């Protein structure tokens, strides 16, 4: 429901207020249910595979759009999966060019808060934010992907940088934040999405 997105809206508006004099407003609206799934992001994709997928995804988005959808600045396709049948989700992705994304989420009330983290992460990709974690290991990259890189001792961190994706517990372990309350948006991410000049 639209009310489930209010947490994400408020989080982003409060984060933006730390960087901008003028308020930034986010309005998230749940669209209609679609019958055709977006093209799957290829596993271990070559550059050519990624380009082909990107073109297919843009074509999919163009074909799915109807006049009742209005003219959103960003369109995220939310793919919900039953955690009883799917233990792990494939990687979500969003494209800055075209401002579209395919977001994989769990369809369970107990996963709502973690879904908000994934949704906010992918939404910021659509506005130009870059990942700040090692794609091979999933670990946040120091210092860019750390919420508090100056902390002494460095570990364990208490929060995740949103685009770092995980809370670093040691140099080789991390955990997913349980909710947006355990994330921050650092200066580099704020600059990438235009909140800092």
Language model: regions and residue ranges:
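A broadly tuned preference for mixed-charge, low-complexity surface segments
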Residues: 25-43, 121-140, 172-182
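Metalloprotease/metallohydrolase-associated module, dominated by Zn2+-dependent proteases
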Residues: 92-96, 101, 106-110, 138-197
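Stable alpha-helical elements in mature extracytoplasmic
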Residues: 4, 8, 115-119, 123, ...
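Residues that form or immediately flank small-molecule/cofactor binding pockets and catalytic motifs
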Residues: 31-33, 81, 108, 167-168
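Active-site-proximal segment of zinc-dependent metalloprotease catalytic domains
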Residues: 61-136
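Intrinsically disordered, low-complexity boundary segments flanking structured domains
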Residues: 12-17, 60-66, 86-92, 144-153
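Propeptide-to-catalytic entry region of secreted or membrane-anchored zinc metalloproteases
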Residues: 1-69
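Structured segments of extracytoplasmic/periplasmic soluble domains
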Residues: 7-18, 123-126, 130, 169
């Amino acid at each position: 429901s639209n009310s489930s997105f209010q947490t994400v809206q408020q989080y982003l508006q409060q984060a933006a207020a730390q960087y901008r004099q003028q308020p930034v407003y986010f309005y998230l609206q749940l669209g209609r249910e679609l019958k055709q799934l977006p093209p799957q992001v290829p596993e271990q994709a070559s550059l050519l595979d990624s380009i082909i997928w990107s073109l297919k995804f843009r074509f999919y988005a163009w074909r799915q759009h109807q006049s009742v959808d209005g003219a959103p600045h960003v369109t995220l396709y939310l793919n919900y999966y039953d955690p009883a049948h799917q233990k792990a989700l494939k990687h979500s992705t969003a494209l800055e060019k075209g401002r579209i994304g395919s977001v994989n989420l769990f369809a369970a009330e107990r996963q709502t808060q973690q879904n908000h983290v994934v949704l906010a992460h992918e939404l910021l990709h659509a506005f130009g934010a870059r990942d700040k974690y090692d794609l091979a290991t999933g670990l946040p990259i120091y210092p860019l992907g750390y919420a508090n890189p100056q902390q002494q001792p460095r570990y364990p961190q208490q929060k995740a940088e949103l685009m770092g994706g995980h809370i670093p517990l040691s140099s080789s372990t991390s955990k997913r934040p349980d909710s947006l309350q355990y994330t921050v948006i650092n200066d580099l991410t704020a600059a990438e999405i235009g909140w800092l000049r």
